[in-house]
């Protein structure tokens, strides 16, 4: 006769099986904002950024900083997490093209092409020197970034954690290798362990089925806007999201 592994829940919002492998966590969401992904969106508003700095922003920078600003009060300090599957791929492609032509790459272009460029621009724009994290994990970038954000929120219950995930379609030269996302998007999620108004339980189980990046964002947004349990089949795991008001 087989027995199911017992689950242990702690105040950290994490559930563990008896073999100590984490397989679920509560995401303590207090606010969120999305740009793109089929949601009616105007041009990303970044008027809060100094004009000199604003001129350096790429379209992805603008959308990422826009959704972040919507979720925050003026002069509010947060632990920032920026996640992107491709990052500033358009800038990187331009730099590689310059190098291939034997031209010196632009120092400014290089400094803005790295994955942590958005956190850096955010810190400058809002004069916030709080810790920042940058994550890129292939197709599972958004799902794994949620775990990182929730973990930081539970580890620092008095702090505000802000997750920004943004991407744009890869340049045509990469079409043979990757096509997603097909449209630019940005989503910001504010997490607060003590002030969550929309706690979501995230559960993952081993699976082999690659899902599209658009599907994971749509699936999570559906969970936030409805009472339904949603799921996404990632490259190595099946992810489930469900509201869990028992954690408030």
Predicted regions and their residues:
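Conserved "HGTGT" condensation-loop signature of ketosynthase/thiolase-family condensing enzymes
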Residues: 1-140, 165-248
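Active-site-proximal alpha-helical scaffold in enzymes
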Residues: 65-68, 136-159
């Amino acid at each position: 006769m087989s027995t199911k592994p017992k689950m242990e829940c702690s105040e950290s919002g994490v559930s563990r099986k008896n073999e100590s492998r984490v397989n679920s966590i509560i995401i303590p969401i207090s606010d969120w904002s999305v740009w793109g992904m089929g949601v009616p969106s105007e041009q990303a508003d970044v008027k809060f950024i100094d004009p000199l700095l604003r001129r350096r922003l790429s379209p992805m920078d603008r959308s990422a900083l826009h959704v972040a600003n919507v979720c925050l009060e003026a002069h509010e300090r947060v632990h920032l997490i920026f996640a992107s599957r491709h990052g500033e791929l358009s800038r990187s492609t331009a730099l590689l093209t310059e190098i291939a032509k034997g031209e010196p790459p632009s120092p400014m272009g290089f400094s803005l092409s790295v994955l942590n460029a958005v956190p850096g621009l955010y810190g400058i724009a809002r004069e916030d020197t709080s810790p920042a994290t940058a994550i890129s994990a292939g197709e599972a970038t958004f799902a794994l970034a949620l775990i990182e954000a929730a973990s930081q929120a539970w580890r620092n219950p008095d702090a505000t954690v802000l997750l920004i995930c943004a991407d744009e379609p890869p340049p045509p030269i990469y079409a043979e290798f990757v096509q997603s996302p097909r449209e630019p998007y940005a989503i910001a999620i504010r997490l607060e362990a003590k002030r969550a108004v929309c706690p979501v339980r995230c559960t993952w189980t081993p699976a082999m089925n690659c899902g599209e990046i658009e599907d994971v964002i749509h699936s999570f947004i559906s969970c936030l806007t409805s009472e339904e349990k949603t799921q996404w089949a990632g490259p190595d795991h099946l992810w489930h999201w469900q509201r869990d008001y028992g954690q408030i």
